């Protein structure tokens, strides 16, 4: 809901365009870049799993993509907004529903949710929950994790005026708001970047 609200506000001021990005349209322009009618000092790539799986035209090294799955369950009684964490998480969403996850796999990226991982998560619910439940949803996704488990934030090591904001695996994703604010402050006020997160560290 928050993202929808922010997106709507940006659209009102014509600061947001929803379209498929084409790297071939990006041009060097003076000390910055140009994309169609838009000009900027730099462009920030936030392509997530698309980069992690090598499906972006912008080559970014250092990823170790991880597949994860979650299920949504309907419980016999309400968990409220509580969270149970014992190997997997179980987060109450209100209305007798909860989200349970997440699994880890380093293959099967092209496949959807698997029966094996669904069973793993349902077994977990039976272990931590004293009551009946029914699975009502099952999803799979790709974490754009990085080999050293730190995000990739900073200038691209080879492409001028191209920056990277990626690598939010299962741990770094919790810090995404802080990391985004950190990058904004660098552009606005010149505050130093986090050296341990620079993409250049992954280039040998």
Residues of each region from the PLM?
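Helical element adjacent to the flavin cofactor pocket in flavoenzyme catalytic cores
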Residues: 1-42, 46
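Short beta-strand to alpha-helix junction loop
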Residues: 1-5, 112-117, 174-175
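Mid-domain beta-loop-alpha active-site segment that forms a flexible
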Residues: 1-9, 120-124, 179
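Short, hydrophobic alpha-helical segments
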Residues: 14, 38-39, 129, 183-191
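Short, well-ordered beta-to-alpha junction loops that form the rim of enzyme active sites
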Residues: 19-21, 47-48, 103, 167
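Hydrophobic residues embedded in beta-strands of well-ordered beta-sheets
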Residues: 28-33, 97-98, 162-163
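Active-site substrate-recognition segment that forms the wall
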Residues: 47-161
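C-terminal catalytic lobe of FAD-dependent flavoproteins
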Residues: 134-204
